[in-house]
């Protein structure tokens, strides 16, 4: 769904508290192909839910549906479009949608007052700054990890098949192979793979395939020296984080050892300049982004 549509309010479940409130005020919720396994916060509401899907959805974690329409999704939607009369959207609802979207982008995804640029780039800024200048048809793949939750809200997609993420099992190491496939399938569109340092270390060997096939795309390696998705939960519970923290690794040297150009950045200006340069090079390029990983925990809807 295009993120610049006035009806778009954001993605439910990740860094989207205002959306929770809007859903509770709805007359009816219609879900289309919704896989509820990845919804982080339990959804409990008295609002009727109509599910349109090719499978039975009552075995999911979202909430038992009031009415399910099971079958060919596109056929069901075509039928409804042709048989339901045109309705004007409430101006009040449009205003609420805009407020919800703005609150997520400006507040929940905003940089905290404790952030210091000298500590690295705020992770939410990575997606926001790159989105400002890359073409609308840019395709991204988001790996598993804390940054994936950010990608769901901070990266604005405008076209179908331009945002790829592995839900459910969320395998680390997904993004590079997915990005290579996306670029082969859509050679005219810029393609960017986003991966955390943990995910990168799990599949660094795929760099050899990338180099051998010489696929012109960009890899963004988001470095905070931790498995933050798990580490954040350990911190909240007072657990030891030794197993989810690790020392700084020379990622630039690893990438270059495969014969791939690498750019390392620690400031937003460097990130913007480096990404623009990588787009112009039109060849395999990795950008190592040194983050202030503490920002993940400072955001209102922390991971």
Describe each model-derived feature in a short phrase.
Residues 40, 268-303:
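Glycine/aspartate-rich loop-and-adjacent alpha/beta segment that forms the canonical ThDP
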Residues 1-97:
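Glycine-rich, acidic loop regions that bind phosphate or pyrophosphate groups
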Residues 19-20, 25-37, 149-227:
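Thiamine diphosphate
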Residues 11, 25, 76, 82, ...:
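Conserved thiamine diphosphate
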Residues 1-6, 40-44, 61-64, 80-81, ...:
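Short acidic, glycine/serine/threonine-rich loops at helix termini
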Residues 34-37, 55, 145-147, 198, ...:
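Short glycine-rich anion-binding loops that position phosphate/pyrophosphate groups of nucleotides
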Residues 101-177, 182, 188, 300:
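Active-site diphosphate/adenylate-binding microenvironment
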């Amino acid at each position: 769904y295009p993120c610049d549509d006035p009806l778009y309010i954001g993605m439910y479940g990740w860094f989207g508290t205002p959306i929770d409130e809007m859903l509770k005020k709805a007359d009816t919720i219609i879900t289309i192909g919704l896989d509820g396994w990845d919804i982080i916060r339990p959804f409990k509401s008295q609002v009727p839910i109509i599910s349109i899907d090719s499978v039975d959805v009552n075995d999911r974690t979202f909430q038992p549906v009031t009415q399910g329409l099971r079958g060919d999704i596109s056929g069901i939607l075509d039928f409804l479009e042709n048989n339901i009369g045109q309705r004007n959207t409430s101006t009040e609802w449009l205003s609420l949608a805009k407020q919800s979207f703005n609150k997520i982008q400006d507040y929940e995804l905003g940089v905290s007052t404790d952030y210091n640029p000298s500590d690295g780039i705020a992770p939410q800024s990575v997606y926001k700054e790159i989105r400002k200048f890359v073409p609308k048809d840019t395709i991204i793949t988001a790996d598993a990890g804390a940054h994936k939750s950010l990608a769901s809200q901070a990266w604005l997609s405008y076209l179908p098949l331009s945002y790829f993420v592995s839900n459910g099992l969320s395998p680390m190491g997904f993004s590079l192979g997915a990005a290579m496939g996306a670029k082969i399938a859509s050679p005219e569109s810029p393609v960017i793979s986003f991966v955390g340092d943990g995910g990168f270390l799990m599949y660094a060997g795929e760099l050899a395939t990338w180099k051998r096939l010489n696929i012109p795309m960009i890899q963004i390696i988001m470095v905070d020296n931790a498995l933050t998705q798990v580490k954040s939960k350990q911190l909240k519970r007072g657990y030891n984080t030794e197993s989810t923290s690790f020392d700084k690794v020379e990622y630039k040297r690893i990438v270059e050892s495969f014969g791939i150009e690498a750019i390392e950045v620690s400031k937003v200006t460097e990130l913007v300049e480096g990404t623009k340069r990588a787009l112009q090079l039109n060849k395999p390029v990795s950008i190592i982004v040194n983050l202030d990983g503490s920002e993940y925990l400072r955001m209102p809807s922390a991971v």
